[in-house]
Regions:
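Structured alpha/beta or helical-core interaction and ligand-binding surfaces enriched in interleaved
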Residues: 1-150
Length: 150
């Protein structure tokens, strides 16, 4: 079980892979940091087969990155813009993968929408920083969906 950010659409979404020279992470267990070099193209978008658990969109890719950078966010915004050429919207989800069925209540889904011409890097940063376990006393998850429209 872990957190996941994925993009979903009614049109196929292309997979994206980082250049092969970015195959390593520097992990410092003493201070709890991870460094992947910070290159703007050091992320992947891989087909996400479990999207049906969260959305009715037919196609999805999961974002795989060590952490947010503005340069990566700009590249993802360009990717979403390209996806909007063949679909009216792209959903961006931040969810907890698996295990939410163990709790008494279904997760709360928080939804928001933004037009692509108003979509900015901070929207991606904020989505990634959302707290999925923001109601700890009830042990109830929150999922977040930001719909980007043309």
């Amino acid at each position: 079980m872990s957190a996941c950010i994925f993009f979903a659409s009614d049109a196929p979404l292309l997979e994206v892979f980082p250049p092969p020279e970015y195959d390593c992470l520097a992990i410092n267990a003493d201070d709890g940091t991870i460094d992947d070099g910070g290159a703007d193209d050091n992320f992947a978008l891989r087909t996400y087969p479990d999207s049906f658990l969260y959305t009715d969109k037919a196609f999805a890719v999961c974002l795989d990155w060590a952490y947010y950078t503005e340069g990566r966010a700009r590249q993802l915004i360009d990717y979403i813009g390209s996806a909007l050429e063949s679909a009216p919207c792209v959903e961006l989800w931040h969810v907890w993968q698996g295990g939410f069925y163990l709790f008494e209540e279904r997760p709360v889904v928080h939804r928001a929408a933004v037009r692509f011409d108003e979509f900015v890097e901070d929207d991606l940063r904020e989505l990634g920083e959302t707290d999925l376990w923001n109601n700890k006393e009830a042990n109830r998850l929150s999922f977040y969906c930001l719909t980007v429209t043309r």
